[in-house]
């Protein structure tokens, strides 16, 4: 089978998810993050910003000793939105240049296809946007992003859950829309709190 690059429309999904998280970063980062027990709001922001650097490093199989600093640095600083775009640029380029969506990337927990790494990054951006600022999900674009994730991210999310980096999935009400189903998949109640006090999304 011939190699298949990531479709342009999937890169567009990544760009839209990045913009969504940027809107969440425009809110105050002080205080605790109720949806991620044990994390502050700044911890949540820094996890996502550092994740952009870590995901890019997986393409070149960088050792943990070279990327460990990204887990503790204050990437957000005083200008979190510009920091998001700066820390996301390298991964965006790697994904755009990836020759095959099925090629395996050595994620820290398991080898996964490039397409799943993309889906996991979009999942991280969209779900943590809700953790920081639930009102960002009122944006018309979020329903489409949630539907895309329900279709493309479910398998890799369940793989991450097997490593105990996500809380248990929530029950899905009958007739639930895409956003509600995505919150349930992520282990969150519609209010944004973790189901049963589960783990934050620490999949990167």
Predicted features along the sequence, with ranges:
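Structured surface interface patches that mediate subunit assembly and partner/cofactor docking
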Residues: 2-20, 24-40, 54-76, 82-204
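Short, solvent-exposed alpha-helical surface patches in non-cytosolic proteins
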Residues: 42-48
């Amino acid at each position: 089978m011939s190699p298949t690059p990531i479709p342009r429309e999937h890169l567009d999904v990544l760009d839209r998810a990045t913009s969504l998280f940027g809107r969440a970063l425009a809110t105050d980062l002080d205080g605790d993050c109720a949806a991620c027990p044990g994390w502050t709001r700044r911890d949540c922001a820094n996890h996502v910003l550092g994740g952009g650097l870590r995901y890019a490093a997986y393409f070149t199989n960088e050792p943990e000793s070279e990327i460990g600093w990204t887990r503790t640095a204050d990437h957000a600083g005083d200008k979190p939105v510009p920091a998001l775009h700066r820390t996301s640029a390298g991964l965006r380029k790697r994904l755009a240049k990836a020759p095959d969506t099925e090629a395996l990337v050595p994620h820290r927990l398991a080898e996964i296809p490039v397409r799943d790494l993309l889906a996991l990054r979009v999942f991280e951006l969209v779900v943590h946007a809700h953790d920081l600022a639930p009102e960002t999900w009122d944006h018309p674009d979020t329903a489409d992003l949630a539907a895309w994730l329900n279709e493309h991210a479910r398998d890799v999310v369940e793989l991450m859950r097997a490593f105990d980096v996500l809380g248990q999935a929530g029950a899905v009400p009958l007739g639930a829309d895409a956003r509600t189903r995505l919150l349930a998949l992520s282990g969150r109640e519609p209010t944004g709190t973790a189901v049963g006090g589960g783990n934050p999304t620490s999949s990167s």
